[in-house]
Amino acid sequence: MRLVKPKKALGQHFLKDLQIAQRIADTLDTFKSLPVLEIGPGMGVLTQFLLEAGHDLTVVELDMESVDYLNQNFPDLKGRIIAEDFLKLDLSKLFPGQFCVIGNYPYNISSQIFFKVLDYKDQIPCCSGMLQKEVAERLAAGPGSKTYGILSVLLQAWYDVEYLFTVSEKVFDPPPKVKSAVLKMTRNDRKELGCDEKLFKTVVKTSFNQRRKTLRNSMKPLLGKDCPDYALPIFDKRPEQLSMEQFVELTLISQKHLEKQAGDVL
């Protein structure tokens, strides 16, 4: 059986440990009624456990060598291998209803994968898998943590994020230079934020662009130098001190100011 050569340009680190693959597959045990999309299956170490568990599985794999391997070794995947870039897929065309996402995510695009999951949050009730330990810690971090950032806030607005366990670099081929971790995100019951969602994203991103400064300084690119709301106590804080609810409050303050500013121009 010819094995696939890992490609550095694609961020490929193939998982070798079957026990860990089984534990990752088990994170979707409560979602067996929904279709599953696996990102970056490589040589199918995780794939085999998802199929054994009876999941309605589709995989997306950019590496044609891996696609050939999967076609040869996983007959159950016939017609279910998408040889494309996950980041460019229109997922709503693939899945008209809800579906779950799982994978041993390519390390070079893991953050981009989660931003895309957010775009389909109403269709994706659960997303789990393996990524760099540092990124997993950042996604699961709470207010007050040095690792709390843009993705932490945006994901936790819509998902309960669980850091499940750490994985040694020794269980991969080739071994990455960093440790990995398994993360699980389960959609919370929030239907809306209570503010404009697009502006919420802009506010979060703007505030963290200068994370060491107080919001009074970091929000100037959006609100200008002389916003009268800077007198409010919330602007004394740094972005990592704010909860998701406080970011909603900050968004409402920003929206009011920007609408007034637009009205003054007219």
Swiss-Prot record:
InterPro entries: KsgA/Erm (IPR001737), rRNA_Ade_diMease-like_C (IPR023165), rRNA_Ade_Mease_Trfase_CS (IPR020596), rRNA_Ade_methylase_Trfase_N (IPR020598), rRNA_adenine_dimethylase (IPR011530), SAM-dependent_MTases_sf (IPR029063)
Keywords annotated in UniProt: Cytoplasm, Methyltransferase, RNA-binding, rRNA processing, S-adenosyl-L-methionine, Transferase
Purpose of the protein: Specifically dimethylates two adjacent adenosines (A1518 and A1519) in the loop of a conserved hairpin near the 3'-end of 16S rRNA in the 30S particle. May play a critical role in biogenesis of 30S subunits.
CDD domains xrefs: AdoMet_MTases (cd02440)
Keyword presence, Cell membrane: no
Binding site for S-adenosyl-L-methionine: 13, 15, 40, 61, 85, 104
Coarse class of the protein's main subcellular location: cytoplasm
GO CC annotations, alphabetized: cytosol
The EC number(s) this enzyme carries: 2.1.1.182
Record's protein name: Ribosomal RNA small subunit methyltransferase A
Matches recorded under Pfam families: RrnaAD
HAMAP family: 16SrRNA_methyltr_A
PROSITE patterns xrefs: RRNA_A_DIMETH, SAM_RNA_A_N6_MT
Catalytic activity: adenosine(1518)/adenosine(1519) in 16S rRNA + 4 S-adenosyl-L-methionine = N(6)-dimethyladenosine(1518)/N(6)-dimethyladenosine(1519) in 16S rRNA + 4 S-adenosyl-L-homocysteine + 4 H(+)
Subcellular location: Cytoplasm
Protein family according to the UniProt entry: Belongs to the class I-like SAM-binding methyltransferase superfamily. rRNA adenine N(6)-methyltransferase family. RsmA subfamily.
One GO molecular-function entry: RNA binding
S-adenosyl-L-methionine recorded as keyword: yes
